[in-house]
């Protein structure tokens, strides 16, 4: 927030989607995850709810009320700041949930507590599109090609800690139709 171009960066950031869907490649890009109870249409709609507040004069109130671990279970009956916080937590903080989809926002490691599962393994998950997500660098050593489950790629490879910055090429390329993972060394301030 003390950067000379902080206002410009914040203005740009508030204009970005919480969920990006590419129809051509049937692929979704999110920061952390998608609530298992949401299908693609619901997820896009819920992302737009938060985006519209971020791009409005209600942004200050949202930022004051955004942080918190509750509610931890999605319900269409949620309203106001609680609803927006729950949506935001799914898109930006989620790693683990229980079998019913209740968030566990305290666990951050690569091994789930006994009563939790990674969000992308939830048995009732409703999205079949390719999903790319970050936010979970501790998965870096568990899956060599970053595909944690068929069609789901964890792209956080620890760049913020001086490790690697990764991306997945989705389009057809000179090597054929196979997806290509690219990874470059990250930069850390000394």
Describe every region a protein language model picked out.
Residues 44-190:
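Acidic, His/Gly-rich catalytic cores of divalent-metal-dependent hydrolytic chemistry
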Residues 1-81:
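Active-site neighborhood of divalent metal-dependent phosphoester bond hydrolases
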